[in-house]
Amino acid sequence: MKVVYWFTYVMAFVFLVGETARRGIGYFSVNATTMIEDYLCGAFLLFAAWVWSKGYDIAPKMMAAAWAFATGGMFVPFAAHLEAWLRDETFRPDHPHTDIASIILKGVILAVCLACLVVTLRHNNNKPSRA
């Protein structure tokens, strides 16, 4: 579970800093929803890691909820981009279907989130250890 704890910080950084670095702060004027979703996800993961580090009783549930939010938040972007590539059709001009690297990156992020969710749920009955 310690690996998941540290991955929580890494993925929070990916959601918070990665989204801004990839799109720029000006993307808020294009699609604020996707930016806010990623920022909320990063903040939720940071909060869950903080609660876990303090050893609060709610920590396992908070960690599971944060990873579930992250997994759900990554499913649609990954699946939509993959579908666009499979259909050979760009659905949104800011997401060209030929951008295979973006599909792979989204798939890796989704896989990490899902793996951390599964580990967290399997570990959910145990009290958090101070990391």
Segments (PLM) and residue ranges:
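Topology signature of small-to-medium multi-pass alpha-helical membrane proteins
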Residues: 1-131
